[in-house]
């Protein structure tokens, strides 16, 4: 049975490194094989909670609970620095200010620490020769400790004009490490809680505001239907994707005129259009590619990206128009 350990009350803040690492994991680049040829697509993607993302200004209340103060300060800092297209997304109002605000973000946060006894196997020398060389080993059990830290804050955002709740969530963050007499704990409880708070802040950021994201998308490389010269130029385009993506797209455009309907060329031109922001052209090309490659999952993913980007841009424009009309 685990033992709950009480933590000290000394001051602790969320480290910038912990928050930055959490944000990188939450909205980083898509993973592709290291050797794959790719193009990078950038665009605005919607918040998970459109109602919360529609808020223009808000107050971050000092949260309750042992770790509420640290979480609320971390959230306030993140929201104050959050920018879309180089402009602040939220106007953060101090808690005791008389300035008007659209909504208030409140919550409660407590981290719990639990230690559990565990055993690990170790090879131990039980017999040595006259030269002190081990000649016989045995597996023995050693007693260790598993430390589990859980952090499950509850958050709520409500509009101040009518009290309507526009965002509510209970987050669940967890970390565990094992230490033994021959291996020290890799990090302290305080550092662990700080990192979990950073993870929670990163989750909230994705919930309540759109994100400008970069995705690394693999191009298609099948050259079926191309002659020797065309295959050579196709390979040149693949090599150019890293240093000269527009040059790669120009090569594929020329090949499309010579061999209309070559599946890789059609898909890659769709990706080129998506990369430069011509989403209408990208959709036309992806639909053509889908008739040639009906089982290609990358095409379905592209439709999802484009749909999300269009929704995010529409929501952003609507919000900006509404907030512009309410500003003095």
Which residue ranges define each predicted feature?
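Bacterial N-terminal signal peptides
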Residues: 18-30
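Hydrophobic, Leu/Ile/Phe/Ala-enriched alpha-helical segments that form helix-helix packing faces
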Residues: 27, 75-86, 201-208
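C-terminal/domain-edge helix-coil "capping" segments
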Residues: 35-52, 145-150, 156, 160-261, ...
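N-terminal regions of proteins, emphasizing targeting and processing segments when present
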Residues: 7-9, 18, 43-45
């Amino acid at each position: 049975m685990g033992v709950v350990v009480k933590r000290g009350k000394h001051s602790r803040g969320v480290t910038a490194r912990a928050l930055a690492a959490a944000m990188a994991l939450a909205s980083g680049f898509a993973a592709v094989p290291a050797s794959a040829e790719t193009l990078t697509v950038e665009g605005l993607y919607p918040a998970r909670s459109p109602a919360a993302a529609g808020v223009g200004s808000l107050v971050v209340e000092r949260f309750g609970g042992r770790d509420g103060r640290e979480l609320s300060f971390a959230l306030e800092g993140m929201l104050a620095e959050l920018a879309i297209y180089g402009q602040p997304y939220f106007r953060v109002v101090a808690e005791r200010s008389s300035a008007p605000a659209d909504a208030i973000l409140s919550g409660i946060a407590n981290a719990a620490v639990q230690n559990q006894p565990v055993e690990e196997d170790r090879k131990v020398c039980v017999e040595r020769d006259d030269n002190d060389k081990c000649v016989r080993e045995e597996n023995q059990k050693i007693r260790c400790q598993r430390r589990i830290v859980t952090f499950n804050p509850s958050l709520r955002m409500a509009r101040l004009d009518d009290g309507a709740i526009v965002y509510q969530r209970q987050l669940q963050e967890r970390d565990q490490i094992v230490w033994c007499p021959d291996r020290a704990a890799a990090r302290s409880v305080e550092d662990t809680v700080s990192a979990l708070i950073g993870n929670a802040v990163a989750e909230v950021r994705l919930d309540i505001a759109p994100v400008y994201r970069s995705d690394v998308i693999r191009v298609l490389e099948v050259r079926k239907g191309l002659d020797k010269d065309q295959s050579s130029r196709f390979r040149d385009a693949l090599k150019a994707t890293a240093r000269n993506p527009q040059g790669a797209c120009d090569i594929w455009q020329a090949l499309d005129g010579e061999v209309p309907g070559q599946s890789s060329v059609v898909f890659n031109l769709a990706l080129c259009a998506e990369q430069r922001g011509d989403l209408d052209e990208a959709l036309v090309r992806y639909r053509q590619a889908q008739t040639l490659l009906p089982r290609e999952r990358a095409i379905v993913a592209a439709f999802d990206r484009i749909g999300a980007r269009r929704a995010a841009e529409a929501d952003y424009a609507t919000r900006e128009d509404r907030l512009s009309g309410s500003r003095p």
